[in-house]
Amino acid sequence: MATPPSIDLGGLGLEAFRDQPVAVLGLARSGIALTRFLADHGARVTVYDTRTADQLAEAIEALGDRRPRLLLGPQVDPAEALDSQALICTSPSVSSRYPTTEPRLRSALAAVEAAGRVPVVSEVDLFLRLCPAATVGVTGTKGKTTTSSLIAAVLGAGEAPVVLGGNIGIPLIERLPELTSGHRVVLELSELQLPTLSQGTDIAVYTHVTSDHLDRHGSLEAYRAVKRRLADLLPVGGVLVRNDDDPVVSAYTVPDRAREVTYARSAPGPASVGVADGWIMAGAAMVPDDHDGRILRLADIPIPGEHNVSNVLAATAVGLLYGVAPAAIAEAVRGFAGVEHRLERVAEFAGVTYINDSQGTQPDAVIAAVRAFERHLVLIAGGRSKGLPVEALAAAVAERVDAVVLMGETTDQLAAAFSAAGLERIERADSMEEAVSRATVVAREQTPATVLLSPAAASFDMFVDYEARGRAFKAAVAAVAEQADTAR
């Protein structure tokens, strides 16, 4: 490999890319945004992806009239894409550390990193190095998207303009030209994005940390180490917003240069947010001297479940840190409509409410979901196993759920676990349409009732992703609603 020039990441500005050779690895959502941004700022971009041009037709079309050098397909040697570059930019799923990265690319990247001549930077890391605005990073195993969205809503009730993005599906790199020091940027950050960070956010918010993606990180300890990276990277004056109800997160400490604000579903201390007497409460150090600390009644939180109380606590803490008035925070939370595929209320008819929690791919998330509902509950679950234990899930389901309809590859595993835990009514379905139909029949036996899709499994055995699974659920519910209208 030829000795490449390099871009100095220290003091990086938007003009640093002009006439510089830059490689982009991966042409999915993040890679498309990187390619457009770099090309628009004068870089000579090379794009590498193992998929063919035919497979990437929509992605290539999304580049518009930009004409990067495209090295596409399984026959391309990734070393060719990395040769003579000033900078290498990676998509979230690409890293020399990940066993899930294509082996040849992983090896070629490792060689570049070992040589130390050319910076390798992710889209999020590049954004944070260039961003002039205050930043809030949100991470955890579950609850990231809802908490990020709540924080954006709460900050939006203040005076500063707010931008939301990151793992929530909106790459932020293309938003850089419009950002100023007066903006607030909220980034949802996944375990894919954290290991490659070398620049932290001004505030690091943690929901909770259990276990997930062990195929990529190898062990629970390695996964947890990745998750705490956002706290480790806090800058001078940075703030860790820490969930003290979580046994892992509550043990996190901050560097001497930063400070911490905690939240928990219990009475708050001076520099924390908590719950007391049916209210979201802020400690004395979090609110003006003439304020009694009461922010919002728990009964006014529009999204169900104790875990969503925790999410509101985190958002409240961030809002107060940025000077949003307590009354404005309360109004923002009361008006929060929730997030698609996360305990999303889809419809209510014939005495049955339908809830889409397709993003509930992990047992812990489903436990929280079933505990969010009091009345007659029918659960739709199943999919591709994530290799996580289901005993605690089975106990919660047997305690809180009247019946389960199972589908997908984990049907037999979940049926055995639920039966052993004492659940008597277990049905099976071969499609989402059949699952919703069967669940509806059971739910109508005792109304009011709730049908909850919360799979406790990945979607890839039957769907492209959890979003496609959620859309299929909503379509099936719409079909049942239409049948109900016709029968009247």
State each model region's role.
Residues 5-21, 33-41, 295-402, 416-419:
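Nucleotide phosphate-binding/pyrophosphate-handling subdomain across enzymes
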Residues 38, 88, 138, 167, ...:
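Residue-level signal for inorganic ion chemistry
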Residues 39, 79-85, 92, 96-244, ...:
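Phosphate-binding loop of NTP-binding sites
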Residues 43-51, 241-244, 378-381, 400-410:
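Short internal beta-strands
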Residues 66-67, 391-449, 487-488:
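C-terminal helical cap/extension that packs against the catalytic core
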Residues 197-200, 230-236, 253-256, 372-374, ...:
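Short, conserved loop/helix-junction motifs that constitute active-site signature segments
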